[in-house]
Amino acid sequence: MACRLFWASRVASHLRISVAQRGFSSVVLKDLKYADSHEWVKIDGNKATFGITDHAQDHLGDVVYVELPDVGHSVSQGKSFGAVESVKATSDINSPVSGKVVEVNEELTESPGLVNSSPYEQGWIIKVELSDAGEAEKLMDSDKYSKFCEEEDAKH
């Protein structure tokens, strides 16, 4: 657990954000927005970077493949644009916001495990140019996402 907290503080420092305190074991970073399908998004002007949350990667297990869209592909909020395959399951990746893909994390082709080891830093999946910045307001902040995960975990 101490190692995870050190990792979280290092990532938060790199992203210039703070770590939310919560009652479950996944790392949730403040200043990011979260979808109920367990994707995170960091908005920077009219650009957004996103990936899957620490909570999602923890439940998936070791990621062995990430299906990435092509640059120029349009993504829509709540719609699938790719998939993450792990030793346990294959899961769709849904877009937390709408936009046009401007960059994909090519490192995931050779090192899909970055999604596990560094979901908020090296394991980001795509960057988009936003088509509707207001969509981010529909997403959860870190406190709501933490509570959502706690409630979801309590059901299982």
Swiss-Prot record:
Signal peptide: none annotated. It holds the Pfam family GCV_H. Transmembrane segments: none annotated. The modification Phosphoserine is found at S131. Binds 1 lipoyl cofactor covalently. Keywords: Lipoyl, Mitochondrion, Phosphoprotein, Transit peptide. Residues 47-129 form the Lipoyl-binding domain. It is found in: Mitochondrion. Its cofactor is (R)-lipoate. GO terms for biological process: glycine decarboxylation via glycine cleavage system. GO terms for molecular function: ATP binding. GO terms for cellular component: glycine cleavage complex; mitochondrion. CDD domains: GCS_H (cd06848). The modification N6-lipoyllysine is found at K88. InterPro entries: 2-oxoA_DH_lipoyl-BS, Biotin_lipoyl, GCV_H, GCV_H/Fam206, GCV_H_sub, Single_hybrid_motif. Residues 1-23 form a transit peptide. Belongs to the GcvH family. The glycine cleavage system is composed of four proteins: P, T, L and H. NCBIfam families: gcvH (TIGR00527), PRK01202.1 (NF002270). This is Glycine cleavage system H protein 2, mitochondrial.
